[in-house]
Amino acid sequence: HTMMGRDMVKETNLDKYIKNPSSGNYREKYYTYKGKLPSNEVTLYEDHDLEKGHFWNLSIDLTACTGCGECVISCQAENNIPVVGKEEMRKSRDMHWMRIDRYYSSEMTKEVSKKEDISSIKMYAEMEEPSENPEVVFQPVMCMHCNHAPCENVCPVAATTHSNEGLNQMTYNRCIGTRYCANNCPYKVRRFNWFLYSENDRFDYHMNDDLGKMVLNPDVVVRSRGVIEKCSMCIQKIQALKLEAKIKGEPIKDEDAQTVCASSCSTNAIVFGDYNNKDSEVRKLRKDERAYDLLDHLNVRPSVFYQTKVRNKQNA
């Protein structure tokens, strides 16, 4: 699996952004029997009815993100995610629900490869070599909670399903570990429990002793061996907020709805909220001209979206 060659990060410079707020944010069109259509209008799926009740969305501003990792650490602590160590990481058995992808600019570009008639394999190999003074982009990636989710329709036991609030849910005690969902996920954000980390002395980090277990979040289940896990959009916090609002007999306030990654972000790069709340910040951001979906050509309609990165260059 590689993400090379795909438009993961969309960016522009300040001068172009001032003239045109949608600069850098383009959507490709595809040939269909109805003519050329943008990717968000081409689909085989039936739409979910998400106009009633809540519709949870999350925005990530690439301009504001500094790649500090606060969101990853807070997610790790909040959701009882096991620490697996270097050896497992080398085997690509990481368990982080969030990751921060780093991209460095290179002297090799598609334009240069065409000019020099270089094969695509050699082009991508040379792209891995950063330039002497590279431009850097940090991109947090978690489960996108797609409304046309490729993972949901391949699970043979319906362990991953779609909620009426736009969330992609996991039923851990139904999962049989086929990993079809992880294979079919274009964002590669699903994690498989190769071991029972909480009871295995090999992973002597924080979970498998009496003192360490006191640190675990009692609102989040500790997953067992052989099941898939992923970002839940902090469903435990959402449910607690809904219960509190129900007891008080008042609607949920936009500022009260928070995932732990959003509340821990020191630059406010991550914003969470209810899209169906017409006054919510996340609704305003979704309608912003900088907003785009990761791998939007797939049209999986994610509930997580990004804001185009704006650079303030000297030659802008």
Features from the language model and the residues they span:
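Non-ligating segments of multi-cofactor redox enzymes
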Residues: 1-316
